[in-house]
Design a protein with these regions (language model features):
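Nucleotide-sugar donor-binding/catalytic module of glycosyltransferases
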Residues: 1-225
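C-terminal subregions of glycosyltransferases and related glycan-biosynthesis enzymes
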Residues: 179-185, 213-307
């Protein structure tokens, strides 16, 4: 039987230190034939040389381009995603440049997608992940079971649980997500997750099939609940991202979103301009996150215009 094919979309920027480990783990997936398409965001280290090395080693499974100008994280991924409109793979996945995929990562996602209730607009999969140190020693799961049980359609309007490097989608959702190119957003993974939750099928796997390497400035995960002054500084620099996401969601998919959800999405879209919308976000119980602490942070973000 011919194995199914998955196109893995990888974005790189100055990632030479861990890139070979990441590429080898993707190309060694079991139960599926993985192909990689990479967009490099004008790296200044040895990243491009490594990409060329893999292109020569895997000419039928690996391709890359170097951007003419720096696009930054979100739009490097989005432009790479939209460049695949003319491709014909069974599945599509996103990939970071510094993690390690367990051999069954993609095949486990495929099995979950195939077991899910079908939807005409396709199925979007994301999963838990194992946070690891720079030497890939596990530190713990990013999402604990208690928090996952509290995830609802209401909470996902205010909190993203889809980490891009865990995302796998079927061909139907890939086509559906190409319907609208979003302008001025942050977080490509949250964008696709919102499309799936409100207009297609979204599934979350509590199991983890990826070692999510923590190093340098990308420290998250098991320490994210601890107070720090660095966290306060990060909050002060934080940009509001939800209104733009909801604006583009309405523009591209508003005709497919259930009426009550659409009203809530429009409230989030307009809260910075309309006092009534801000008050609704502050006092309506539908606008919450998965714990009292996270909901309090949400209300502070709304009050300060950071949401």
């Amino acid at each position: 039987m011919t194995p199914k094919k998955c196109l893995v979309l990888l974005c790189t920027y100055n990632g030479e230190q861990y890139l070979r480990c990441q590429l080898d783990s993707v190309l060694s997936q079991t139960g599926v034939e993985t192909h990689i398409r990479c967009a490099d965001d004008r790296s200044t280290d040895g990243t491009v040389a490594i990409l060329e090395e893999y292109r020569e080693r895997y000419p039928d499974r690996f391709a890359y381009t170097v951007n003419e100008q720096n696009k930054r994280f979100t739009y490097n991924f989005l432009d790479l995603f939209f460049s695949t409109a003319d491709t014909d793979y069974d599945y599509y996945a996103f990939c970071d440049q510094d993690d390690y995929w367990l051999p069954e990562k993609v095949s486990a996602a495929m099995a979950k997608i195939e077991a899910a209730e079908p939807h005409p607009n396709g199925v979007f999969y994301c999963s838990n992940l194992t946070v690891a140190d720079e030497d890939l020693r596990p530190k713990g799961l990013q999402e604990d079971p208690w928090m996952l049980r509290r995830t609802t359609t209401a909470t996902v309007k205010c909190e993203n649980i889809a980490t891009g490097c865990t995302v796998v989608m079927d061909a139907a959702f890939h086509r559906h997500a190409l319907r609208h190119y979003p302008q001025g957003i942050l977080l490509h993974d949250f964008w696709l997750f919102l499309i799936a939750v409100f207009t297609a099928r979204a599934i979350y796997d509590k199991n983890a099939y990826i070692l999510y390497r923590q190093h340098g400035t990308n420290q998250i995960g098991t320490n994210k609940k601890k107070f720090s002054f660095a966290g306060l500084r990060k909050f002060s620099r934080m940009k509001s991202k939800y209104p733009a996401l909801m604006r583009e969601l309405v523009a591209g998919y508003g005709d497919l979103i259930p009426a009550e959800d659409l009203r809530d999405i429009e409230t989030i879209r307009d809260y910075r301009q309309k006092f009534g919308c801000r008050m609704k976000l502050l006092f309506c119980r539908r606008f919450r996150r998965r714990s009292a602490k996270l909901t309090l942070i949400l209300k502070v973000e709304i009050l300060t215009g950071k949401f």
